[in-house]
Amino acid sequence: MQHKSWIIFGTIYATLVQVCLTLDSISGDDKIVSLPGQPKVNFQQYGGYITIDERQHRALFYYFAEAETEPASKPLVLWLNGGPGCSSIGAGAFCEHGPFRPSGDILVKNYYSWNKAQDNLEFLQRWFTKFPEYKGRDLFITGESYAGHYVPQLAQLIIKQNVKFNLKGIAIGNPLLEFNIDFNSRAEFYWSHGLISDSTYESFTSICNYSQIRRQSTSRTLTPVCSRVIRQVSREISYSVNTYDVTLDICLPSILSQAQVLNQLQDTEKIDVCVEDETDKYLNRKDVQQAFHARLVGVSNWTFCSDVIKYEMQNLEVPTIHVLGELAKSGIRVLVYSGDQDSVIPLTGTRTLVNGLAKELGLNTTVPYRAWFGGTQVAGWTQVYGNILSFATIRGAAHEAPFTQPKRSLVLFSSFLAGKSMPESASLTEH
């Protein structure tokens, strides 16, 4: 089977870190000669630190993979993962849509690769100083989950401060946009997918809902009644279910061994449910950290998510859905998409929010709700409002959609960057 061009746009993956380095010590050549175990490639990679606050020794670590073909003419994509506090390099670059996936001690090709707001803006400004040849490129800011805060807030700041970036659009997947609606949609998802009983659904909606539980847990004031409800929900769902994709198996030692064999055979149609374990092992290798020009300061090991950087958890409750409206009114294209097997931020809440925003903005439906295709199969459903605000689902996809549905995610994202409608009929030719 032939595959599409490997990396179709340059992608920056950025993660906030705390460093005790001087500017001189991190301003050297960031070019990555080669990552340990990687296959031969025809594109350049860079990794290093961009200081955003010299006084407090704060920096963003980035990994940048150029487009494989004609990199000088391809758009630039900034990808931010959520959490808060989770790694865009570990999750986005190595588990989802970066150029490689780890497999044991080596890296294998990913054929469906996608090659606090003020801090992110400072990062972009300084990154463009380091890479001035990219400043005129079309820029798209993208992310998932809690990046439903980071991404629109960064785009809003670029517009408000009239920063001269060529910002064209934002895309956010399974995003946290409104605390109550997003979190309370879990109950319906659990019940409709057979994960909880009728009586537990009733308790989870009328006695104590998930937004109440989350709010109380954050403030450490969980009441006995809410504690009983969430224990019952957890008991029925089972801890052996992956809530980020309820159809996906969990990683077990025997599966990990099998996954490494399959990956080395480059069976790219298989989902490696143990990719996080393999990524964790790979990124904790000293030779890999040296190749990335990375330095662990204040922590013993790299982890997917960390609380070393402190986040105000109350910010979870700050709604960002109306920021999307401001961006759309400013002419910035907005795509909100949902992996339809995610129970953490289910599509039902997201669809309700986007539909409500379109009504609030007075946007007419320009593409009625319909199926879209990836190759010969239905890949999801989509609706477009005013040719500026789009909602789409990715069929069979997880919270991290490119992880479980890389091909469909690539079709969605490529169409959005090109300003094209999602394919509305089956293609008999696979690329």
Regions found by a protein language model. Name each.
Residues Q2-H431:
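Terminal and linker regions of secretory-pathway proteins
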